[in-house]
């Protein structure tokens, strides 16, 4: 805290007015001290509110993050959480997905909070995903115009998500205020709703610092914010099954199931001089899955129906989706997995598909 400003020399007051002069000077000094201290205290409160014993100081805090109006609140992600590998992976996966969707628009997003806050990119993203056209101005520079565009875009998002029970954990002010947590909640919900061909890391949780200004002072608190749970829960499509239990509570039994499935698939793929040692990776492109179904049902799959040597994500998804169609044709139920999950090396999804085949064809020679 800075000291009080030096006082200029003043003539000695007559003795009879000593008390009055002393109190007057003291009052002036205290007033100057108070004013200086208020400025310094506000800066120090901002620093101490953001820093906490459980986390290092935020070195990239913007000045505006500690300049709040009375009763105003601002949130920011704890720096430790920003460095968490799963958080970084979530941000990267979402960035890559957005850029892939908007590739034809020649839009490249480099930083979520800086590139999405004004509604321009969100508008284009929603129009692409929902195959619609929003009635908004193409370019808006003013804050009012940006918020009006955001309002229109978020209302369209709400119309899509709310009927399906998605919690809306964002609003115009949080998105326009570059609140990364709110932006991530929005993007995760969109990715799940539109079944994006991506694999979001599960159980991503961040610590959020909430700073509020009350009676001229800044107060902070930490809250835990869950950004993702599991794919099944976020999709809201599947009930827990035996594989959830195996993965969560019985890894030893899970290994036995994997060995049994490897034995089962090799029993048939060996007829084509093919052998599987890793279920997670060797079924990811869909080729072995298609060939296995042909062997199990004793038919030849025309090569023009699938990609024998797929070299892109879309071709692999096509192969797995085609295999799912063959399963339906064979009288099996639709697998409790998405083709994208199998392609993205989600072991649980791959095991579910193979176990479905095992239960029907385990006695086939």
Curated annotation (Swiss-Prot):
InterPro entries from the entry?
CH_dom, CH_dom_sf, Parvin
PTM description = Phosphorylated by ILK.
Q: Where in the cell is it found?
A: Cell junction, Focal adhesion; Cell membrane; Cytoplasm, Cytoskeleton; Cell projection, Lamellipodium
Segments carrying the region annotation (Disordered) are 1-52
Q: How does it sit in the membrane?
A: Peripheral membrane protein
UniProt superkingdom: Eukaryota
Keywords on this record?
A: Actin-binding, Cell adhesion, Cell junction, Cell membrane, Cell projection, Cytoplasm, Cytoskeleton, Membrane, Phosphoprotein, Repeat
Which residues does UniProt call coiled coil? none
Q: Does the keyword tRNA-binding apply?
A: no
Residue numbers of Phosphoserine PTMs? 8
Tissue-wise expression: Expressed predominantly in heart and moderately in spleen, lung and skeletal muscle.
One annotated GO molecular function is:
actin binding
- What GO biological process term is on the record, naming one? cell adhesion
Keyword Phosphoprotein recorded: yes
Which residue ranges does the record assign to the Calponin-homology (CH) domain? 88-195, 255-362
One Gene Ontology CC term in the entry: Z disc
**Compositionally biased, Pro residues: which spans?**
1-12
Extent of Basic and acidic residues compositional bias? 37-47
Q: Tell me which family the UniProt entry assigns to this protein.
A: Belongs to the parvin family.
**Self-association or partners: how does it assemble?**
Interacts with ILK, ARHGEF6, PXN (via LD motifs), ACTN2 and actin. Interacts with DYSF.
Q: What does this protein do?
A: Adapter protein that plays a role in integrin signaling via ILK and in activation of the GTPases CDC42 and RAC1 by guanine exchange factors, such as ARHGEF6. Is involved in the reorganization of the actin cytoskeleton and formation of lamellipodia. Plays a role in cell adhesion, cell spreading, establishment or maintenance of cell polarity, and cell migration.
Please state what the protein is called.
Answer: Beta-parvin
């Amino acid at each position: 805290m800075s000291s009080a400003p030096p006082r200029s020399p003043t003539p000695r007051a007559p003795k009879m007015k000593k008390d009055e002069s002393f109190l007057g000077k003291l009052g002036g000094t205290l007033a100057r001290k108070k004013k200086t201290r208020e400025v310094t205290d506000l800066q120090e409160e901002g620093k101490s509110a953001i820093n906490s014993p459980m986390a290092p100081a935020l070195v990239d805090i913007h000045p505006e993050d500690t300049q709040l109006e009375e009763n105003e609140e601002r949130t920011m992600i704890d720096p430790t959480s920003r460095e968490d590998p799963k958080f970084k992976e979530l941000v990267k996966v979402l960035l890559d997905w957005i850029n892939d969707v908007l590739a034809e628009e020649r839009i490249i997003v480099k930083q979520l909070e800086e590139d999405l806050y004004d509604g321009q990119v969100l508008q284009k993203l929603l129009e692409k995903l929902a195959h619609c056209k929003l009635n908004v101005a193409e370019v808006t520079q003013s804050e009012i115009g940006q918020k009006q565009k955001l309002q229109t875009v978020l209302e369209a998002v709400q119309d899509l998500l709310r009927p399906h029970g998605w919690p809306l954990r964002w609003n115009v002010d949080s998105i326009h205020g570059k609140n990364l947590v709110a932006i991530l909640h929005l993007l995760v919900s969109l990715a799940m709703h539109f079944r994006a061909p991506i694999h979001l890391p599960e159980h991503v949780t961040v610590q959020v610092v909430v700073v509020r200004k009350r009676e001229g002072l800044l107060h902070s608190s930490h809250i835990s914010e869950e950004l993702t749970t599991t794919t099944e829960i976020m999709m809201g499509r599947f009930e827990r099954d035996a594989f959830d239990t195996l993965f969560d509570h019985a890894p030893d039994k899970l290994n036995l199931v994997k060995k049994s499935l490897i034995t089962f698939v090799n029993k048939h793929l060996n007829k084509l001089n093919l052998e599987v040692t890793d279920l997670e990776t060797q079924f990811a492109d869909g080729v072995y899955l298609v060939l296995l179904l042909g062997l199990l049902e004793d038919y030849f799959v025309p090569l023009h129906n699938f990609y024998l040597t797929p070299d892109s994500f879309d071709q692999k998804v096509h192969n797995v989706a085609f295999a799912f169609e063959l399963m339906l044709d064979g009288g099996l139920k639709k697998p409790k997995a998405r083709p994208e999950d199998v392609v993205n090396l989600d072991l649980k999804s791959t095991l579910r598909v193979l176990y479905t085949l095992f239960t029907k064809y385990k006695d086939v020679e």
